[in-house]
């Protein structure tokens, strides 16, 4: 197999699952930004965004859940390394036309491996928390477009998902 072809880093030469050995890698500044969206019915979105109905409580709870999920990522994803997070930030924007809550998670570290999984886990858990807190008003809520939007640092450098 050529070195220029992509490989699955969590499989060894015989195809067995393995944790990537990062022991000899140098620490580097690393940043990852992930995005997700939660789409719901106009009625549920109206309840979420109506003044006095708890938008702040729902989004603040989702924010804390996202931060906690990033911190626990290595316990949730079997081959993830535990790493020292320097920062986790969760931001929300409201799409009134699409009845969506858009989520952006940013994770930062100085370590031997990246924080992409932490950022995507943070986004996913924030989205699940919004679902949980709004499901009484809409069982058909959809979590969509969980994705890595940006990463920097390490051997592969900067990458954008435009």
From Swiss-Prot:
Pathway: Cofactor biosynthesis; molybdopterin biosynthesis. The gene is moaC. It holds the Pfam family MoaC. This is Cyclic pyranopterin monophosphate synthase. HAMAP family: MoaC_B. It comes from Bordetella avium (strain 197N). The keyword Lyase applies. Catalyzes the conversion of (8S)-3',8-cyclo-7,8-dihydroguanosine 5'-triphosphate to cyclic pyranopterin monophosphate (cPMP). One of its GO terms (molecular function) is cyclic pyranopterin monophosphate synthase activity. It is an enzyme of class 4 (lyase). GO terms for biological process: Mo-molybdopterin cofactor biosynthetic process. Belongs to the MoaC family. The active site is at 132. It catalyses: (8S)-3',8-cyclo-7,8-dihydroguanosine 5'-triphosphate = cyclic pyranopterin phosphate + diphosphate. SUPFAM superfamilies: Molybdenum cofactor biosynthesis protein C, MoaC. Keywords: Lyase, Molybdenum cofactor biosynthesis.
